[in-house]
Amino acid sequence: MQITRESKYIIGLVLALGVSFATLLAHLFTKPSLEWVYNHHATPFFANKFMLGGYLLVEYLSFLLMIVPLLMLGDQVNDFTFSIIHTSIWYNVFVVFTVWAFTREKLYWTAFFSLCLFSSSFTMYGQSLRLRNGFVEMISMKLPSKLVFGKSLWFVVYAFSAALHCTGIGCRVFSNVFIWFFAAMYLVPILGFHDWALSLVSAYLFLSIGIGQMFIHLFALQHIFAFIIAGLMTLFAALLFLLPYRQRRAALTGESAPLLQDNNAGPAV
């Protein structure tokens, strides 16, 4: 019996997700635990762990949704879908190495693997943009790609700040400035591709940073800036979500204007 291409990708994805999730879960109970190491290495971009936990749970559930097009479409699955799933498998492999390095407090290796995670997530996000905006594609491919890309960009910044471990006054001032450049990194794809969903994802992440900084009280003003950025990202998401409807309404108004003028015009004398 020959195993189909779809079956191979389903098996590979389920195995990668299982190993990745089991690694995360197991290191919650090791010594030192994942939670202890994360709390011990608070940085200016330390995010609330409970909000991150909820984010990770949604992310793993969204990964499982990648199986949907393979089961529903069969031979009609395009190459971009297979490519996204293939990249997501590698992403979960890098998660295992990242957790291993982080729980052993090998922070420079953690920073290196964070770049591997970001590279994989960036590839996933770029490939997902080539898919059509159908409901199945949105929940099964685009949503996981946006969640992974948003979190990976945050984790790169957190991992490098943890590796450098600079807590002096100069670093604190730099962090208060850099958080705005960090927000601008999200705005490039958000505004470039009119991605309201990614804007919501980034708003959630900045909100978690704000709450995390508010509780640890290590870096002055950082939580205030994070809350402001979260509000701005939410506003951008709302505007980008409504933009197609406004454009469609403007187009319909423009098309109906000549007809109204013709109807209002009197007969030629």
Swiss-Prot record:
| Source taxon at top rank | Eukaryota
- Do the record's keywords include Transmembrane helix? yes
Query: Which spans are transmembrane here?
Result: 9-29, 50-70, 82-102, 107-127, 147-167, 173-193, 200-220, 224-244
Name listed for the protein in its UniProt record? Uncharacterized protein C637.03
Q: Where in the cell is it found?
A: Membrane
**Key words of the record:** Membrane, Transmembrane, Transmembrane helix
GO CC field = membrane
Q: How does it sit in the membrane?
A: Multi-pass membrane protein
SS bond partners: none
